[in-house]
Amino acid sequence: VQDFVAAWKADPAKVTIGGGSSPGGPDHLFPMETAKAAGVDPTKVNYVSYDGGGDLLTALLGNKITAGTSGLGEYVDQIESGQVRVLAVSGDERVEGVDAPTLTQAGIDLTFTNWRGVLAPPGISDEDKQAMVKVLEELHATDAWKEALVKNGWSDAFMTGPAFESFLNEQDTRVETTLTDLGLV
């Protein structure tokens, strides 16, 4: 990680970072926030947007980009075969079976997760909302949920109600700040 950051600081435009999302998406926001935390000017980051993980992997394996950002679950086979090397993981904890530090352990003060949520339309009744939450809580308690977390290298960040609402507000602020810093908002 230190060698990568040193090269990035020396010439941010030369270090190409690929991601499977358009500007504003998680694969774009992550390297921008990483750059800022590592002391690289995010406006100088050379981000290449690909149409999903398959195109990103092709570019990475073909040496068209310096590094890529994606979920571990998308590239398990390539990681296990040694075709792709994980420099760091962006969650709070190391991922079991992956020989890579967290960004924080590597000296970059950043945690970044690509979360998923279940949202309902405005005006949903309290009864329907509680029924949805109950189903999600039941799913969360299953072995299948736990197995999916391990299989995909995901962190269990399950939350509902006010905790999830607070998280969404924090995410809105974080994204707006990053996009504003980049001059995109």
Can you annotate each of these PLM segments?
Residues V1, G68-Q78:
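Ligand-binding clamshell of periplasmic/extracellular solute-binding protein-like
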Residues N63-K64, Q83, G107, G153, ...:
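Conserved functional loop/turn residues at catalytic and ligand-binding sites
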Residues D11-V15, L61-S70, Q83-V86, T173-R174:
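Alpha-to-beta junction loops
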Residues E74-A141, E170-T173:
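C-terminal lobe and pocket-closing loops
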Residues A38, E80, T102, D126-V185:
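An extracytoplasmic/periplasmic, membrane-proximal ligand-sensing/linker region
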Residues V1-D55, W115-A148:
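Hinge/capping helix and adjacent helix->loop/strand transition within the periplasmic-binding protein
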Residues D3, T58-A59, D77-Q78, T102, ...:
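Well-formed, non-transmembrane alpha-helical positions, independent of function
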Residues N46-T58, G71-E74, P162:
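Short helix-initiation/N-cap motifs at beta->coil->alpha
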